[in-house]
Design a protein with these regions (language model features):
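Active-site cofactor/cluster-binding pocket
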Residues: 1-113
């Protein structure tokens, strides 16, 4: 099981971890530690994807940063596959910036492992 939480304020109002099984991974866009109960055996990875997006893209659009974090945490997607997908979706400078955001998040998660 995997979940990606783009807005960490949801955790206060919604049990985003409901139904997650042991061995699951939750990636949460936040600069803070999670203080909500987490099911046994679920690994929570926090990453400040908003700051990464602002720094690399210039906008608080977190999608590619969170996908980079997901690729690193899960191993389900090779970074090269993510990079290729970004290049198919975006062109020029926008592709370069989104790849940089994904790579920064990927490296941050790999470095924390």
């Amino acid at each position: 099981d995997y979940i990606i939480v783009q807005d960490s304020t949801l955790i206060k109002d919604v049990n985003v971890f409901f139904g997650m099984k042991e061995g699951g991974i939750a990636i949460v866009n936040t600069e803070k530690a999670i203080d909500s109960p987490v099911p046994k055996g679920v690994k929570v990875i926090t990453i400040d994807a908003t700051s990464i997006a602002l720094q690399k893209i210039g906008l608080p659009i977190t999608n590619t940063a969170l996908m980079g974090a997901f690729a690193a945490a899960s191993g389900e997607i090779a970074f090269t596959a993510l990079e290729d997908a970004v290049k198919r979706r975006f062109r020029g400078d926008l592709a370069t910036k989104n790849i940089a955001a994904a790579k920064a998040a990927f490296d941050a998660v790999k470095g924390a492992a």
